[in-house]
């Protein structure tokens, strides 16, 4: 039962900047996790790592290998993306407003409060302190909000809230006044600053600064002789019309011989930042000492809207600007020609970024939890994903374990592809919260129950609501099920305490089951019999024979409110959970209690900020609200008002394992001990909303209602969502399960879908390397290298290099992503190769070793599987015809009398 975290679905984008690497790989923060989406394959995966709180800043290395993730508590993770592991950790001393790798990948610029710090990127050598700070610029008068490196990684353009942008020379210069150049004239914060490059010389000749009030400043650079003699006084520098001579902003070398009235700043002389040799400096022009001229100032004309996100593409000379009213503009620079001006939503855009080629634009809206990628040339969407805005209430697997359906308080039903991690259907017909879901056995239709008084049936082929089940008097439905044959649909109510039974085909009410005296929150048909089990807050579980119309067959009484009910897959056992934290197991045939599990202590843990008692004494309110049997019925999963999902062995009534659904401190109930100094007269200080979201740039939070305390005269705060699990569902294959939690839908799986391939790091993947591996009898490695090269002749050569006795071992070592290519090669060999038994042996071992993987990815592998089936069928037919012909010939020869 080695379940591991595999993916996160349904979680909304909650803010922070998105990053695109390798032109098609979109990296975005999802709470305290990182989501990676391959736009070319439409595949999304969430990395199996967490930060302490919600992520607010991301930055990737130029080659896309490393990722920096900074959370709200200034803790930074240095992540290796190919291996999906955290390499290093560091904590900054103040809020991080901007973060960026240098183009050469050697340095990292971090805007920490008013400071700009230059850190050396961790290398491949092991070190006690992998991060090395090599320089600090303390020239800004307010928070730094934007950074941009020059192409040669020698200059840094910094924008801040003090209405100015500064150009720094990162290197230390000998005998030259290292004073930052100021770009002034802005009337609001500089939210974006970028370098423009001359396409002929590939040198910086322009700069663009974007103010929060919607004005774009274009600056031109002119080289001039600014070299200084070592004996020349610093005051001999001719003052620039846009650079005031401020003594407190000058950074000089220690003992550099500049005027004594200038303030000296001692800095660490970091390796790699020292100046060039004196002989090389004679012919060098320093960009921060040259002449910068304001060429033009253009306004976006968005009235009272503010700029909240922007990006610039050097190759296309284009600027994209996102505003607080949901409008974005795409402009051709430097002439400021508007190419597109469109509205995405009515909420502010929190991120806007180009891809490497510049043909795709990525936008994020934290208020709506929406992330989309748009091709501005063809005006089409490449990706449009939006998680559930509110908590997910229910989740269920399809019978083939390929699809996952979710329903939430935002009145929407979403259907997800489990393998790709993307949502491909969203149904919005419900007008109130969706409370229950049920997949039909045909795998093509879904039932959903809602508080709006309807039960709807959805068709996946036509993407529509083909039938709606209602009652004469509107009722609120909180539970739903259907019989295994799909003829009857049943739903339990919240207000009338009844169970309605409809005919699935006609939609007419067949029966109304009465007897419960409280809301019916649990409902399930027996998998093998015609019994219907219902649980209610009236301390009872009732069994009904719906088809015989006999009413209640049997009643199981409890000592507390019954919250949910679940049948074992064989239908001979029934599990029910109660408000006191117990799980009761009943024999449905004999009608007796078999086992009882005391789970209150197992689910205990986590203290909410408004709790008056400690976590150790707060277990009285903990209970299991959802249960789910395993495919074989040997263990059961239980979860509820806690941060844990518990797995129990039913026969021994012992806790096998406990899964913590999140370590995100932005949620309430994660910690066992709270800091007493954070308690004030108005309540916990963390629940007081004292931040101004309009000034937080790309950071925004979703509104979850008035959950906390309010200050007099201030608007109600948003509070913190409480961590819990509302629904569980185990895949029919038994190899994965899904949990609808506060963070989203977590998927845990036994199958290790990610296997790190060391050959991905090799630079010598050549045909010669394949030949050498074959000669060294490393056929597994040779096969992997040949499939990476994707050369058909090499792949076939490696297949024949494997001895028949070693085929099984080599087949097991083949990676999942190479299965399709290997099958295509086997199909070609079946059609053109005389070694039929050898190739069939390969096919047999591939199917044995990767059967579960092929079943999970059958949609992707379907073309290769069909080709393989056709090739085998054709070979079988040819052999059958030959054998039949030979058989008839032998019969004829045997029947001919021997005349000799």
From Swiss-Prot:
CDD domains, A to Z: WD40
Any one Gene Ontology cellular component term annotated for this protein: nucleus
Superkingdom in the source lineage: Eukaryota
Matching Pfam families: Utp12, WD40
Up-regulation conditions: Induced by sucrose in guard cells.
Key words of the record: Developmental protein, Nucleus, Phosphoprotein, Repeat, Ribonucleoprotein, Ribosome biogenesis, rRNA processing, WD repeat
BP terms from Gene Ontology: embryo sac development; regulation of stomatal movement; response to sucrose; rRNA processing
Residue numbers of Phosphoserine PTMs: 275
Entries under SMART domains matching the protein: WD40
InterPro entries: G-protein_beta_WD-40_rep (IPR020472), PWP2 (IPR027145), Quinoprotein_ADH-like_sf (IPR011047), SSU_processome_Utp12 (IPR007148), WD40/YVTN_repeat-like_dom_sf (IPR015943), WD40_repeat_CS (IPR019775), WD40_repeat_dom_sf (IPR036322), WD40_rpt (IPR001680)
PROSITE patterns cross-referenced by the UniProt entry: WD_REPEATS_1, WD_REPEATS_2, WD_REPEATS_REGION
Region (Disordered): 228-284, 684-720
Cystine residue pairs: none
Record note on disruption phenotype: Impaired maturation of 5.8S rRNA, especially the processing at the 5' end. Reduced siliques size due to defects in embryo and female gametophyte development. Defects in guard cell function leading to reduced stomatal conductance and impaired water-use efficiency.
Biased composition (Basic and acidic residues): 261-274
Tissue: Expressed constitutively and ubiquitously; observed in seeds, seedlings, roots, leaves, stems, flowers and siliques.
WD repeats mapped onto the chain: 10-47, 50-89, 91-129, 139-178, 185-229, 302-341, 344-384, 387-426, 429-468, 472-512, 515-554, 557-596, 619-658, 720-759
Record note on quaternary structure: Component of the ribosomal small subunit (SSU) processome. Interacts with TBP1 in the nucleus.
Family affiliation: Belongs to the WD repeat PWP2 family.
Function field: Involved in nucleolar processing of pre-18S ribosomal RNA. Plays a role early in ribosome biogenesis, especially in the maturation of 5.8S rRNA. Required for guard cell functions.
The protein's name: Periodic tryptophan protein 2
Taxonomic path: Eukaryota, Viridiplantae, Streptophyta, Embryophyta, Tracheophyta
């Amino acid at each position: 039962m080695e379940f591991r975290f595999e993916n996160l679905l349904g979680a909304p984008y909650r803010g922070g900047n998105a990053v695109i690497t390798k032109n098609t790989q979109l990296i975005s923060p999802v709470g305290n996790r990182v989501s990676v989406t391959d736009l070319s394959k439409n595949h999304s995966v969430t990395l199996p790592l967490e930060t302490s709180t919600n992520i607010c800043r991301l930055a990737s290395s130029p080659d896309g290998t490393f990722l920096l993730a900074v959370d709200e508590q200034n803790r930074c993770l240095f992540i290796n993306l190919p291996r999906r592991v955290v390499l290093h950790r560091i904590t900054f001393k103040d809020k991080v407003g901007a973060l960026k790798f240098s183009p050469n990948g050697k340095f990292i610029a971090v805007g920490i409060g008013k400071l700009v710090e230059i850190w050396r990127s961790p290398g491949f050598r092991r070190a006690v302190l992998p991060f090395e700070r090599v320089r600090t610029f303390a020239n800004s008068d307010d928070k730094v909000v934007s950074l941009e490196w020059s192409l040669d990684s020698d200059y840094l353009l910094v924008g801040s809230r003090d209405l100015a942008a500064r150009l720094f020379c990162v290197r230390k210069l000998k005998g030259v006044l290292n004073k930052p150049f100021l770009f002034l004239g802005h009337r609001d914060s500089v939210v974006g600053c970028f370098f423009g490059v001359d396409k002929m010389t590939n040198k910086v000749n322009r700069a663009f600064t974007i103010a929060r009030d919607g004005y774009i400043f274009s600056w031109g650079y002119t080289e001039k002789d600014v070299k200084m003699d070592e004996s020349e006084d610093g005051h001999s520098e001719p003052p620039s019309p846009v650079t005031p001579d401020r003594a407190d902003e000058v950074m000089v070398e220690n003992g550099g011989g500049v005027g004594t009235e200038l303030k000296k700043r001692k800095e660490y002389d970091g390796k790699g930042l020292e100046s060039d040799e004196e002989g090389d400096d004679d012919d060098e022009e320093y960009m921060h000492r040259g002449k910068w001229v304001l060429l033009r100032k253009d306004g976006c004309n968005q009235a009272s809207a503010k700029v909240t996100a922007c990006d610039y593409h050097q190759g296309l000379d284009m600027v994209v600007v996102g505003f607080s009213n949901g409008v974005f503009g795409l402009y051709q620079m430097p002439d400021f020609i508007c190419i597109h001006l469109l509205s995405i939503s009515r909420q502010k855009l929190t991120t806007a970024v180009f891809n490497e080629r510049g043909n795709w634009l990525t936008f994020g809206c934290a208020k709506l939890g929406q992330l989309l990628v748009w091709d501005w040339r063809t005006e089409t969407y490449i990706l449009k994903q939006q998680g559930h805005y509110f908590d997910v209430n229910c989740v269920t697997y399809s019978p083939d374990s390929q699809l996952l359906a979710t329903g939430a308080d935002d009145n929407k039903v979403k259907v997800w592809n489990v393998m790709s991690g993307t949502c491909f259907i969203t149904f919005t017909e419900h007008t109130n919260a969706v409370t229950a879901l049920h997949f039909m056995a045909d795998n093509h239709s879904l039932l959903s129950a809602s508080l709006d008084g309807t039960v709807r049936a959805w068709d996946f082929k036509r993407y529509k609501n083909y039938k709606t089940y209602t009652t004469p008097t509107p009722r609120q439905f909180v539970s739903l099920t259907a019989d295994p044959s799909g003829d009857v649909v049943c739903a339990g109510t919240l207000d009338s305490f009844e169970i309605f039974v409809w005919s699935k085909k006609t939609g007419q009410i067949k029966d109304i089951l009465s007897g419960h005296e409280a809301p019916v929150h649990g409902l399930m048909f027996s998998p093998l019999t015609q019994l219907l089990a219902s649980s209610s807050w009236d301390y009872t579980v009732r069994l009904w024979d719906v088809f015989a119309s006999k009413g209640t067959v049997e009643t199981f009484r409890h000592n507390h409110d019954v919250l949910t009910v679940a049948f074992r897959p064989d239908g001979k056992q029934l599990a029910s959970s109660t408000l006191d934290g117990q799980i009761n197991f009943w024999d449905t045939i004999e009608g007796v209690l078999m086992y009882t599990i005391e789970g209150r202590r197992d689910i205990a843990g986590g203290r909410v900020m408004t709790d008056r008692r400690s976590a150790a004494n707060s277990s009285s309110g903990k209970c299991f609200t959802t249960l789910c049997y395993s495919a074989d019925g040997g263990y059961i999963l239980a979860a509820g008002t806690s941060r844990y999902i518990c797995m129990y062995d039913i026969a021994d009534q012992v806790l096998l394992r406990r899964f913590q659904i999140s370590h995100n401190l932005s949620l309430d109930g994660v910690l066992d001990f709270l800091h007493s100094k954070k308690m004030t007269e108005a309540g916990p200080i963390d629940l007081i909303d004292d931040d101004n979201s309009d000034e937080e740039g790309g950071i925004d939070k979703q509104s979850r209602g008035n959950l906390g305390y309010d200050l007099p005269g201030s608007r109600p705060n948003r509070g913190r969502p409480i961590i819990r699990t509302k629904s569980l569902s185990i895949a029919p294959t038994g190899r994965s399960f899904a949990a609808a939690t506060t963070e989203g839908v977590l998927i845990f799986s036994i199958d290790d879908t990610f296997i790190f391939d060391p050959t991905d790091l090799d630079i010598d993947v050549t045909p010669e390397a394949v030949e050498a591996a074959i000669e060294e009898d490393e056929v597994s490695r040779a096969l992997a290298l040949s499939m990476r090269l994707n050369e058909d002749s090499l792949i076939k050569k490696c297949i024949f290099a494997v001895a028949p006795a070693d085929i099984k071992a080599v087949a097991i070592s083949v990676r999942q992503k190479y299965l399709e290519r290997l099958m295509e090669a086997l199909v070609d060999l079946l059609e053109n190769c005389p070694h039929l038994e050898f190739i069939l042996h390969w096919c047999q071992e591939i199917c044995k070793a990767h059967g579960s993987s092929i079943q999970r990815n059958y949609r992707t592998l379907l073309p290769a599987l069909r080709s393989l089936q056709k090739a085998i069928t054709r070979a079988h037919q040819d052999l059958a015809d030959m054998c039949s012909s030979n058989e008839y010939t032998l019969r004829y020869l045997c029947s001919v009398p021997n005349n000799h």
